Amino acid sequence: MADRKANGGGASASSSGTNLLFSSSATEFSFNVPFIPVTQAAASPASLLLPGEDSTDVGEEDSFLGQTSTHTSTPQTFSYFSQVSSSSDPFGNIGQSPLTTSAMSAGQSALPKPPATLAFTTGSQDALSAFPPSVSKAPGATPPSQMGTSTYSPSQPSSLPPNFGSPPQGIPQQGHNPYRHTPVSSRANPYITPPQLQQCQMPGHSSYPPPSGPPVQTYQMPPGPLPPLPTAMQSPAQQQVPARPAGPLVQGPSPFVLQNQYEPVQPHWFYCKEVEYKQLWMPFSVLDSLNLEEIYNSVQPDPESVVLGTDGGRYDVYLYDRMRKSVYWEEEPTEVRRCTWFYKGDTDSRFIPYTEEFSEKLEAEYKKAVSTNQWHRRLEFPSGETIVMHNPKVIVQFQPSSVPDEWGTTQDGQTRPRVVKRGIDDSLDEIPDGEMPQVDHLVFMVHGIGPVCDLRFRSIIECVDDFRVVSLKLLQTHFKKSVDEGKVSRVEFLPVHWHSALGGHATGVDRNIKKITLPSIGRFRHFTNETLLDVLFYNSPTYCQAIVEKVEVEINRLHSLFMSRNPNFKGKVSVAGHSLGSLILFDILSNQRDMCVSKSPGSVAVSNGVIKHSQFQEKLISEESKLMSDESCDLDVEDEEPLTLHGTLEALSLFDYISTFEKEKIDMESLLMCTVDDLKEMGIPLGPRKKIANFVKLKAAKLEQKKAAAEKKAALAALTKGQDESAPKTKEMASPSSESNESKRKLSVGAYVSSVRVDYESFEVGTGQVSVAYSSLDFEPEIFFALGSPIGMLLTIRGVARIDEKYRLPTCKGFFNIYHPLDPVAYRLEPMIAPDLDLKAVLVPHHKGRKRLHLELKESLSRMGSDLKQGFISSLKSAWQTLNEFARAHTSTTQLQEELEKVANQIKEEEEKQVVEAKKKKESPELSKDEDYLGKVGMLNGGRRIDYVLQEKPIESFNEYLFALQSHLCYWGSEDTALLLLKEIYRTMNISPEQPQH
């Protein structure tokens, strides 16, 4: 370069006004204005990608101008992966495109060529070393490779020039990027207007320095910011030359331009979640991520205590610790990351975020690459990862065991590089918009049999999460107008987990059942074991009280916690139960009292999920003791006057038969044991016999009442004693010691529930129901939703043959029994209320506003059958008319004609009746309306229908037994079920859904 500069300088000195390109003596070359070939105009994308080819062309142009250096280096084959870094900067060995030169003086005949490669490092260097005036190459030196190899080391800020990142002083910034706004490359138009013509076209600019000064070199700014030249290294002419725009014919940009456009990456926050024993990184919603980013970028007085609620307030994020913790239930804390860079391998289904520190390093290197426009770079990190940045869109990561060799192949042929991605796509469908902070309605959902809720063995928390997501989507499709108007926000669903109250693992029941379980169809047997255990536990006196108390305490705890975190909540509360959970809720709601009673001093007090039993005991003991004292007084009076045989017969006016009873050796005790047949054999007449039988019946009933009262009194005393010792005894139940295990278990169980005789509420038939002490809820539920409920079956087993039409839940207005037609656990309730009405369950509409295809096919087939029937009747009518005409023609009997006319009229009436019924079916939907039977199905749901059946899927209709078990667990992801709940909830707010928008 030094030789080129010297030659160029000599040429300029010898012929200041003549250009070497047009110094030929040929007459046909006559130009008024000389043209100067440009070595490289504004760099086009093609020229940036092929620096070696551009440098070759530049060399040819310089050779044509007589500026060829005596020491020309021959390009050699370079390696992408075997270059050795000469500096700590990973971009130091990457080849650069040659820099352009532009004429600044009108008297220059030839322009010196700038250095072929301008080193752009972040190491310790000054501005003088960044822009040397001349660069000389040693003979045989190989050009730098386009792709260098470097070990990652963070750049030192102290080594940067003070004005790094900004254009040199005195030169205004240009507002465009040369790599984006240059339409034509230097090859397409290699000429620019000479300085003389530019000076004439721009008279407003200052004059150029005189030719006697040193040659002015103005380089086109390489990609990235250039440090300013020291003032001492600049000539006075250079310090005075301002920037001037290019003329109209200039295709390239102005000499000094801005760096390439770098846009900071938009971060998004993620959290780690374990799904089916795999850790998945799930994105926060857009709203939660923006809130986290805002708090992250703000200044907090106490950053360690910053807690932000996410996921609608169900989780808290501790920003300093990067942890996400649940609010309403027990769950392991999970990690939170501020993510900007991601990777995905062959076996990964989604992009996985890098750590925040590693992402910051990648972002710094990406910024350098964009600023300097240097790509095809390989970054090696101390942990062994190797990342290659080919271009902004193609970035790959090689594992430590699969580092590619110089040919680009990996040692392990099966391992492919990971795809590296910067930022997230704005149009990513899996990122939700976020939940509104306002809650319209609160629903507590109680799980059913077993600790899992579906065939994927997921917990109630995960299933309720799916149900909540489905409800949010339906709000956007079926209540969009109300959502846009601000009338509808969202419904919050909170799970209620009670299975831990059983303590089956501690008592050894689960272990014993495992020993006797057959090894075949293991998953199905595991599911049935959990199912049978819960049903048997709930019907047992040992665990029924524990299950009921657990559900009541958990619901009150969740309600209190929700109200404390949402003090402005003005909505109502509903409850929903699945399977056995619906039966538990039904028993609890059936034994509730009015809120005025539940808020009395005797109600159950809840503080942080612990029941304060003192007031409850006082009320229970006072009420029950009063009742028992009254009964005992009556019984004591009867005991004071014991009846004898003589007294009894005198009271019944049957003393005349005393001899008969004495003859048979009958006393008062044996009299009470006599039956009607015994009295008949003794010769007692019918009248006296009836009197004695009635007396015996009444006396036996009184004795039974006395016995029941005594047992109830003893049970009450034991129950109050057990409540005083409930906390320590429960711990003993949960962890029985090996010593005298049987005796301790008996002691703890006896003190807690059933060491005394358990009272059953018995009926004429059935097993009866265990008497349980119920406490009051802290709220009045608005609606009770039963999903796949066995309430009807268990009530029938208990002995409840019929539910009174006037019966309603004391504190709950609505009740909906929702079930799938193939659910083996679900049962109806309306036949128990109105057995005389043959009503089909209400068919739940499809969430897309139509019936399923196979149901429509059934309707069309039934319609076809009715059409065939009508056709048959019409043909019969025509045949009858033909016979009538034949009879008229062959007989004159008026009586026969009247009979034929009667038959014809009857056929006509039946036909008209069928037409009317067909019209009604077309006008009204197939499903039964609530209004048609308002008040006829009892007051359990306020006079409205109770049973609602979902539409089965077409594939389920092929084999009902195959999908029976799945249908019992389908409610958590059912759009039809969620839409029915939303409709009924917002119906209480006088908000109706519009047509579905799909």
Swiss-Prot record:
All residue ranges annotated as the DDHD domain in the record: 777-987
Source organism (scientific name): Mus musculus
SAM domain residues: 640-703
Annotated PANTHER family: PA-PL1 PHOSPHOLIPASE FAMILY (PTHR23509), SEC23-INTERACTING PROTEIN (PTHR23509:SF4)
Compartment(s): Cytoplasmic vesicle, COPII-coated vesicle membrane; Endoplasmic reticulum
UniProt cross-references to InterPro entries, sorted A to Z: DDHD_dom (IPR004177), SAM (IPR001660), SAM/pointed_sf (IPR013761), WWE_dom (IPR004170)
Cited Pfam families: DDHD, SAM_1, WWE, WWE_3
GO molecular function, one term: metal ion binding
The UniProt record lists the keyword Phosphoprotein: yes
Region of interest (Interaction with SEC23A), ranges: 1-363
Any one GO BP annotation for this protein: acrosome assembly
Complex and partners: Interacts with SEC23A.
This protein's UniProt keywords: Cytoplasmic vesicle, Endoplasmic reticulum, Membrane, Phosphoprotein
Polar residues bias spans: 65-78, 94-108, 143-158, 232-241
Job of this protein: Plays a role in the organization of endoplasmic reticulum exit sites. Specifically binds to phosphatidylinositol 3-phosphate (PI(3)P), phosphatidylinositol 4-phosphate (PI(4)P) and phosphatidylinositol 5-phosphate (PI(5)P).
A GO cellular-component term linked to this record: cis-Golgi network
PROSITE patterns (alphabetical): DDHD
Stretches with biased composition (Acidic residues): 54-63
Main location, first listed in the record: membrane
Protein name as catalogued: SEC23-interacting protein
Keyword Phosphoprotein: yes
Chain intervals with Low complexity compositional bias: 79-88
Family under the similarity heading: Belongs to the PA-PLA1 family.
Membrane topology value: Peripheral membrane protein
